[in-house]
Amino acid sequence: GLPGMLLTMGNAERTEPLLVIGPKGLQRVVNALRVIAPELPFEIRFLELEEAKQRIQFDGFYIDAFKVNHNVVCYGYSMVVERAGKFQVDKALELNIPKQCWSHLQKGETIEVEGKEITPNMVMGDPRKGLKVTYCTDSRPTDSIREYAAESDLFICEGMYGEPENQAKAKDKKHMTMQEAAQIAKMANVKELWLTHYSPSLIRPDEYINEVRKIFPATVAARDGRMTELKFMD
């Protein structure tokens, strides 16, 4: 769990501050868990979410947090890596912009050339498609999950139950079946779905994957430690 992760980071000699984002009350819970990790070589900072929908902007990417439907307050998260448009050399030459100034415009900086202000939008094309990863566990299917997961390169979603007969239990416990997660992935037009957060009684989640792929073919029954590399389209 979280204490083990914090200890691992400390043992890896991490010194930069760690930002932890979660529902209201997060700091109290984490501080209580830290009884086994009281001394860490880095600061923990907290961002407690209070709105139903909240965007957290970082340098080059942002995270959209959105409430989901569970027995306690839970959020899903969609991380989007933004990507600027292509630098248009012909426009830069037309404006007589010195080559040594091009990198400043590519970084989003405004420059001045011969007394004239040059802004990035004068030489940059339209923003290109970036990368998007959406993560959601502990919820019944909701419209907000589908909306925030739309066009994700990777959608990581709970598949608590694989057996159709557990549909009633999923509704009662406010969880999803694998089939429901696959249906969201299909409607959201994601590239790939990783199922996770299985019921302890679900010993072999792979047993259900062929049936789930009839709904959404690009489905994986993920396990701890699974990794992938996402790449820009161009």
Regions from the PLM with identified roles:
Residues G1, R28-V29, S144, R204:
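Phosphate- and divalent-cation-binding pockets in alpha/beta enzyme and binding domains
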Residues G25, R140, M160, S199, ...:
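Catalytic metal-binding/acid-base residues of hydrolase active sites
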Residues G1-A12:
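Di-metal (Zn2+ and/or Mg2+/Mn2+) metal-binding site signature of metallo-dependent hydrolases
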Residues E16-K24, I156, W194-L195:
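Short internal beta-strands
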Residues I36-L49, A218:
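A glycine-rich helix N-cap at a beta->alpha junction
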Residues P217-M227:
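Conserved phosphate-binding/catalytic loops in two-lobed NTP-binding clefts
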Residues V29-V35:
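Active-site-proximal loop->helix
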